[in-house]
Amino acid sequence: MLISKTVLSGLALGASFVGVSAQQNSTRWPLHDNGLTDTVEWDHYSFLINGQRHFVFSGEFHYWRIPVPELWRDLLEKIKAAGFTAFSIYNHWGYHSPKPGVLDFENGAHNFTSIMTLAKEIGLYMIIRPGPYVNAEANAGGLPLWTTTGAYGKLRDNDPRYLEALTPYWANISKIIAPHLITNGGNVILYQIENEYAEQWLDEETHEPNTSGQEYMQYLEDVARENGIDAPLIHNLPNMNGHSWSKDLSNATGNVDVIGVDSYPTCWTCNVSECASTNGEYIPYKTLIYYDYFKELSPTQPSFMPEFQGGSYNPWGGPQGGCPDDLGPDFANLFYRNLISQRVSAISLYMLYGGTNWGWHASTDVATSYDYSSPISENRKLIEKYYETKVLTQFTKIAQDLSKVDRLGNSTKYSSNPAVSVAELRNPDTGAAFYVTQHEYTPSGTVEKFTVKVNTSEGALTIPQYGSQITLNGHQSKIIVTDFKFGSKTLLYSTAEVLTYAVIDGKEVLALWVPTGESGEFTVKGVNSAKFADKGRTANIEIHPGANNVTVSFMQRSGMSLVELGDGTRIVLLDRSAAHVFWSTPLNNDPAEAGNNTVLVHGPYLVRSAKLEGCDLKLTGDIQNSTEVSIFAPKSVCSVNWNGKKTSVKSAKGGVITTTLGGDAKFELPTISGWKSADSLPEIAKDYSATSKAWVVATKTNSSNPTPPAPNNPVLYVDENDIHVGNHIYRATFPSTDEPPTDVYLNITGGRAFSYSVWLNSDFIGSWLGTATTEQNDQTFSFSNATLSTDEDNILVVVMDNSAHDLRDGALNPRGITNATLIGPGSYSFTEWKLAGNAGFEDHLDPVRAPLNEGSLYAERVGIHLPGYEFDEAEEVSSNSTSLTVPGAGIRVFRTVVPLSVPQGLDVSISFRLTAPSNVTFTSAEGYTNQLRALLFVNGYQYGRFNPYIGHQIDFPVPPGVLDYNGDNTIAVTVWSQSVDGAEIKVDWNVDYVHETSFDMNFDGAYLRPGWIEERREYA
């Protein structure tokens, strides 16, 4: 709501600001709160938390894509270490609700409460986005799969059936979150309603209301409020499409407190052609214009990006390893600074950590990996993009004046080079300015040198004044500051980028950085002398004393150098590589801590935390190898502990402690061997009895789905039979006749990259192998390769995999058989249809891993993939064999148990590699093919969908907690051969990295790996 408070964007800057006063914006912007609390406020400039302005820099991760609660701390510590002030999560209604009326917020990773307590403990604000629809390339966009039958109406509108279905989840999750709101002493600052739902108007120009959409949004808001949510409500419009839910545009039903915009300027998928209709022709590094849109959409609210591109998902058939080429460190450098140039003051990267689509969590668009080319990779490694993002997030955290700026210009007129554009941002209260420089044509990758005209408190200047020109080298942007406060000091200007600062023993330590080999220049006010404390790694050094300032010009080679000013202020000069491993680590858990109560550490791969106990400085973090470390800390520090061990200090001169940490940590995996194998498709045998609890007889004659099936059979859609994910098995019978059928026509829908195979009386009659984009297939299969029975029923078996439910309105698209028709000289009908479900159907026998982990294969139903299963029916696989093979068409399960013993103090990242015959892997000695589908299970978790005929993913990271790092690990692989020529795969595992770490990777994760239970036998 609008309230009477206002913030004046004033002119009180002083006459010394040449040419600035005339440009200042004197608009009086209203200061808003939601009428329930003023703990979180906002205006045209930024969010205010407890009265203090914040530049909110956040990033997203999904707890349900890393189902190990102990590792959530690992991720949050890495997010905190980089300088992010916040993080964001989606909740997942479908993950928490296996059946109507049932909610699970307790078992394993379903209990996400620890994320909110960790946010408080570690010191990060939290943006929570509970849906009920989240998209997220999740199965059905995060809706429970039991809602996809059509029985609940259109979904995502005010249909009473849908509202009744969602209310238990929505009310309960609001109650769970409420105690952790910032208004109740927690760190949750914003609560999102729905997701990318630009459905407020039937006609935006006339504001003809979309009543169903408005009432739906209002209902969600009301229920959240009724259940304790008093934080500001937000929403994220997609891709500058639409003008919904903004209080600045209307007083219509359903408006939220703060509206934001999601944008993926490169493309949200590696297949960039999918984004052409939204972003236009794909041009690498071409930025988009948000400034004008925000002025139109939300002029009295902060320019807010609840999702900005942190990477892209890799679709079926996409490149092995993802699409990082145009989404790497250069992307982070250019695009995130470009947002700042457009006055965006609240950013959340999607994704900061992507994780894994284990089980059947993925939508039809993606395979197992959800790495997303994120700054933190799927295996939790910090990649170069993380460090390149970190040098900006460290800056925005301490650049307090950046949270209130007007954009006074944006053109090439500031620059001496017409190829370089500059946006001038200025704080109307302090006069601090930020000049964001980039190529005028952002896709340009040229090297450009230039000077910049700036206005400062000491007049108009062209900078640098003495040194070499500023350089933009390729796809790069730089933020040049003027009148920048750090502690009690002021930078008149700096052409080197500010990284961070700290006030230690009452003296400022400022870190500046330039790319290796480039020049920088800075002027500090209030002091007129400087000296280089370390000249060993710089060149072309010039010091220019002034009457009341000192200017230093430098060219930075690799590493770190130190300049000391006459009053004891220290300036740390860094090249890019050194800046990447220069950490600003607070001594407290205040998310807003900026410069005080901070130590600076250079060298480690990661610094997680710092604590000063008496004169003991205790640091925790990770080391890749032997590393020389420099620590800027109070002079009172008498000892340094790293990960609980006292270090040997080499030097402690001038308040800089140097030491060497770590060694060359190593770990070798045991060989995976001892495989045993069994049939996992007994259902094709004529003597198989489909009478166990796994089977349901299809008797329903009318479908609730908006896409009705053919009327010649009962409803064969899996969801209407309480079966939702994975592989599905149909078993149909039809009688023998004198003029038997010759073919069967099948029309099956399974989503992108799905497939199916068909058997008649145990004889294989064909497969649809699928494609990366085909969601439905109809095909006629001949019976010429099968033997029809002359005196008893014939048995037709269809095995399909349901790749997932579609997103948005497509969630209602059916899964399963739409039409099955016998063809021949006579008239035929099936006697009976049965479907095999997962063990327990919607009453899952394994609530820890449920409800998206298991399908209906025999091996899954009886629990061969689970720890503790006695594999008595198995056959030994030859110890000389490096391959798992299936002769002919069929499905087999392979299983082994391998122990691990990872020493305490190591973070060992492990990935499985699955390969099949191809021209780039290996040639099968027996002529087996890659026409197969395999599922990788690790201690009961399905952690890999391997479809070599379609997809290119071969590496499958599996985290500790799923893997038992100090015990036996049950590894199972189901191999579905879809060809008469048989199939072959090789399974191995590799160490991705080994780090010495403070993080306890030997936590007790046994509760996450429940074993086999006897009840499984009832689903054979």
From Swiss-Prot:
This is Probable beta-galactosidase B. It is found in: Secreted. InterPro entries: Betagal_dom2, Betagal_dom2_sf, BetaGal_dom3, BetaGal_dom3_sf, BetaGal_jelly_roll_dom, Galactose-bd-like_sf, Gly_Hdrlase_35_cat, Glycoside_Hdrlase_35. It catalyses: Hydrolysis of terminal non-reducing beta-D-galactose residues in beta-D-galactosides. One of its GO terms (biological process) is polysaccharide catabolic process. Its EC number is 3.2.1.23. One of its GO terms (molecular function) is beta-galactosidase activity. Keywords: Carbohydrate metabolism, Disulfide bond, Glycoprotein, Glycosidase, Hydrolase, Polysaccharide degradation, Secreted, Signal. The active site is at E196, E307. Glycans are attached at residues 25, 111, 172, 210, 251, 271, 410, 455, 549, 596, 625, 702, 747, 785, 819, 880, 919. It comes from the Eukaryota. One of its GO terms (cellular component) is extracellular region. Disulfide bonds join C270-C323. Substrate binds at Y90, N135, A136, E137, N195, Y264, Y372. Belongs to the glycosyl hydrolase 35 family. It comes from Aspergillus flavus (strain ATCC 200026 / FGSC A1120 / IAM 13836 / NRRL 3357 / JCM 12722 / SRRC 167). The gene is lacB. Cleaves beta-linked terminal galactosyl residues from gangliosides, glycoproteins, and glycosaminoglycans. Gene3D superfamilies: Beta-galactosidase, domain 2, Beta-galactosidase, domain 3, Galactose-binding domain-like, Glycosidases. Residues 1-22 form the signal peptide.
